[in-house]
């Protein structure tokens, strides 16, 4: 279950929900067994320079090798930038969760 966080200056006009849905679709295209991508958006009114930082974390898997990550990064960058209409600094970071990370679903 990947996670995607959008951290951005609130002077950007963007539809965070649409971008998060698109991120999930790109990840699932590259890795159909990845599951749902949990997403959050954090616009901030206090910032220095207009920017968008996209942080994606995934569990390490054998098939998520260098070639996989390069293709995923390129497709994510292209997809996300298609939703931007203003100049801004853009950063994309894809990282792997540590072996101590626990993820599951809680049902009371």
What residue spans do the PLM features occupy?
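Short, low-order "capping/linker" segments at domain edges
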Residues: 101-108
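C-terminal structural segments of small proteins and small subunits
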Residues: 75-101
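Short, conserved charged micro-motifs
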Residues: 13-18, 63-68
